[in-house]
Amino acid sequence: MSRATLDKNPHEVASMFDAVARRYDLTNTVLSLGQDRFWRRETCAALGIGPGDKVLDLAAGTAVSTVELAASGAWCVAADFSVGMLSAGRQRDVPKVAGDATRLPFADESFDAVTISFGLRNVVDHVAGLEEMARVTRPGGRLVVCEFSTPTNRAFATLYKEYLMKALPRMARAVASNPDAYVYLAESIRAWPDQAGLARRIEAAGWSQVRWRNLTGGIVALHAAVKPPR
């Protein structure tokens, strides 16, 4: 299987990420034109974490984002269903756990905050994954979802679509260890709901106070929410 399909068979998606793990971080930086670093900083700021907080970084990949979150003084654990991705980040000194977002291997109310960046699209059942995130978060705890979204300017949206479907696959062939995986990336972004649509899914999973903020013209959106009190 060279790339996953949009039916998101978990084993196919995990295998696809295993195949891109070796050059994943470099490829992300190149294909995002360096914006990935900015998106990670904004995600950390939106979480508002600090010493004493317990944080789950879901779909953490090689744990680059987890290390940056841990710089806040919070205790952070990286979780991903791709063992290859976690292995590629083995030199990063944070706890790592392999697990499925729809069946997280953590007890109820284990975390003060949960975040998932560019991974919710790959979960076979988005609402079930969001419900699991709520289960492992304490009442009053925070969720931040950083995900590709819909550009707000029509002309920019047209250019972005051209980049996704034409330029990105060509660039991936030059730098990625599995270029076909980035065709799946482009297709999954096109099929993803817009900002309001994702907000509705988050609310449907039981989160409250859902709001979002656009980054890079809406290419990415940060959705934040709170787990309601009991």
UniProtKB/Swiss-Prot annotation:
Pfam families per record: Ubie_methyltran
Entry's EC annotation: 2.1.1.163
Pathway(s) this gene product operates in, as recorded in its UniProt entry: Quinol/quinone metabolism; menaquinone biosynthesis; menaquinol from 1,4-dihydroxy-2-naphthoate: step 2/2
Gene3D superfamilies: Vaccinia Virus protein VP39 (3.40.50.150)
Reactions catalysed: a 2-demethylmenaquinol + S-adenosyl-L-methionine = a menaquinol + S-adenosyl-L-homocysteine + H(+)
Taxonomic superkingdom: Bacteria
Described purpose of this protein according to its UniProt entry: Methyltransferase required for the conversion of demethylmenaquinol (DMKH2) to menaquinol (MKH2).
Name of this chain's protein: Demethylmenaquinone methyltransferase
